[in-house]
């Protein structure tokens, strides 16, 4: 009969130590998995950290240098909306208007420049802002057969700039654009007068031509054309009136004879 081998004290101690080591390793593995799991959860379910005001400002400036004006406008808008009191915000507001202007989004540019003036009426860039509003409105002009409210507003802003900031470089530029606005407004009036002329409405045409002759003396070619057309339109208008009177008289006699 074979005797059973009894465990020695050394083997018992070793087994106990081994169990503790394995348990410790298992705990570390579980902790590592949990931490990595939290990282995965954060990655997929938590929103990414927002860009700082400085990062958004620099991103917008980089996009402007690359002439990616849409991306620039987006960056400046995020900065303006998320960090309204940042030291970068004022410059971002003006740069946003510039981005719209350079992207030829002239109505949006005009509104952005106007908003800047409203928020910062004493800012040193106001002469530039007034000039840019005028330019944005002027560039919105399409043709003389469309409403010219944008041209009228452009003229008003250029005039404000010239009167309020006469010594600035932008006031000198505004002077030339005011002449352009006056020319376009005169041509608009002549276009309407010509429509009346072509449709035989000589009285209305004469009034429009006369208006240009009397109110646009700073546009010589328009005054010359309007004066010539006004004279002829007036004569034709009087002729038409005389013809109407004659027809009315003849018509009354015809009616009288029919009654007899």
Swiss-Prot record:
CDD domains: BamD. InterPro entries: BamD, BamD-like, TPR-like_helical_dom_sf, TPR_rpt. Its main location: membrane. It is found in: Cell outer membrane. Keywords: Cell outer membrane, Membrane, Signal. Residues 1-37 form the signal peptide. SUPFAM superfamilies: TPR-like (SSF48452). GO terms for cellular component: cell outer membrane. Part of the outer membrane protein assembly complex, which is involved in assembly and insertion of beta-barrel proteins into the outer membrane. Part of the Bam complex. NCBIfam families: OM_YfiO. Belongs to the BamD family. PANTHER family: CELL DIVISION COORDINATOR CPOB, SOLUBLE LYTIC MUREIN TRANSGLYCOSYLASE-RELATED. This is Outer membrane protein assembly factor BamD. It comes from Nitratidesulfovibrio vulgaris (strain ATCC 29579 / DSM 644 / CCUG 34227 / NCIMB 8303 / VKM B-1760 / Hildenborough) (Desulfovibrio vulgaris).
